[in-house]
Structures are given as C-alpha cells and as structure tokens.
Amino acid sequence: MQQTSRYQTARRILIFWTLFIGIGAVGGALMMLLDPSGKTMGMDGMLPYFQVLPFAEVVFQDLTFSGWALLIVNGLTNLTAAALMLARKPAGTVLGGIFGVTLMLWICIQFYMFPLNFMSTIFFIFGVCQAAAGYAAWVFRKQEAFTVNRADYPHIGDDPTRLVVFFSRMGYVRKKAYEEADRTGAAVYEIRAAERTEGTLGFWWCGRYGMHKWDMPIRPVDIELSAYRHVTICSPIWVFALAAPVRSFCKAAAGQIREADYILVHHQKDTYENAAEEMDRLLGVTHTSLRSIQCREGTYKETSKRKEMIV
C-alpha cells in the first residue's frame, strides 16, 4: 500500500501557519502604519507599555516603528517562506520553522511588556506549532529522500556460508546490512513484522513495543539458519533496547545459529552493549564482534567497533 508522504503533510501544515501568521502580521502592520496614533483601531492603549523598552523616547512615541518591525519580522518573512514552499523550494521549510521561533521570541518581548493576556499567549502557542511543523517537515524530507538500492551491492550472495539478517523501518539498517553483505559476500534475509511499523502511526506503535520491551509478532522464519557458518544480525534500537522484531527473531532462531556478530543502528551516541548481550542470551551464543553505529536522518557515525575475536 502506498504510504502518504509525511513530508507533504507537514509542508502543507507549515504553509498554513506561514500564511496565517504572515497575512495577519501584514494586516496588523498596515493598521499601525496607516494610523500611527493607534486611536482608530483602539491600539493607543498599548503605547504606555512600550516605554519600558530601550530608546522608547525616540521610536515608541507612536506605532510607526512597531508597524515596520511587525511587517518585516513576522509579515514579509513568513510570506516569503510560504512562497518558497509553494514553489517547492527546500529552503522554504527551513525558513518556515525558523520564523516560528522568531514569532516566539517576538511574543517573549510582549510577555515582558504587557500583563499576561490571551492574545500573546495564543500567538506564542502558534509559534510553537509553526516551529514544530517546520522541524517535522525538515526531518521528514530528509527521511523520504533517503533510498537504498540493492542493485548497488553486486557482491551480495557470493559466499554461501554467510548470512546477514536485518530488520529496518526507514531503510537506515537496511543500508548497513547491504554494505556488510556486499563486503563479506553474504546472503541477506529480512525480518518482516506482522504488525504495522510504517509511517507516523507505525513509529508510535513500535515505540509502545520498545517501551515495554515486548516481543513483536513476525512472519515465520523460512530460512535454514543452521546451514550458514556465520550470521550477522543488524538491528535498530528502540527506546534504548533491542528492537522488538529482532527480539522475536532471536527467540525463534535459538539454537540454530552457530556463530554470530551484531550491527546496531541507533540515534543516540552510545554502544548499546545491553542489546548485544540480550541477543547472546536469546540465541545461546557469544557474539564474535559488535559494531554500534549512530544514524541521524541518514548520516552515520560509528560509536564503537570491536575486532573479531577467536572463540
């Protein structure tokens, strides 16, 4: 089933926020510039509060400076970001998120100037929503741009005595599994979960399994593991522990694997030796090596590498 693009969803939400904030800021700025006294729209009552700001006797005797500042800081900026996103320019999502932070900083000045009020509070929340949408769009774009093509690894399967087993939601573990199989000539076997793991709902569902350290149902293991001299198991880390589908695989494979090493892929800068020790217990083996790799949106950094041991 074709998955809905999370990037496009976040991008549309961010376009809404940039247009909403941008158009509102332009409207407010025009009211200030057309009537700097603020009397027409009842904004003259705000001027006494501006006197706590630096250079108030010069720039805050009327609303002219405030109008220009609002137009530039929250109006034109957000409309520019919206235009870039409508033109499908990646810079638009980055700027849209940044301008959400700008709005929050703007409102922080209002918190300093004015008594606690509904408008300042709600627009601060709007800024949080805009910044969050911008960050989500940036992350989802990088995730969806990440691809792994098996055809790029021509030596997979050259050595019939080795096997690489992996589970991967986003493709990050798959890439490392293919690289290892291409390096050693191993065949590959993918663990497939019987639960939903794709997309945002899949992320939260997997997090539930990870938090409780439950086993996740997987498709039957239809490969003769004992036929391989050496098996490499590649696993993501879920909530600081072994991924649930890999845990289920290890239980199903107990006593069938003669020799194993592990590759762990995760977001944090850690080694996660606890996951390797858990796989050892479940499989009834002692791993010959462990590689622990930090991955953030497709950028890898090895956090530990153990040389193979003779056992």
Regions found by a protein language model. Name each.
Residues 43-49, 55, 194-213:
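N-terminal beta-loop-helix "entrance" segment that forms/cooperates
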Residues 2-156, 251-252, 281:
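Topology signature of small-to-medium multi-pass alpha-helical membrane proteins
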Residues 29-30, 36, 186-199:
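Early exported N-terminus immediately downstream of N-terminal targeting peptides
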Residues 89, 117, 198-200, 305-306:
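Intrinsic-disorder/low-complexity, polar/charged segments
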Residues 129-163, 168-192, 205-311:
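FMN-binding flavodoxin-like domain, especially the glycine-rich phosphate-binding loop
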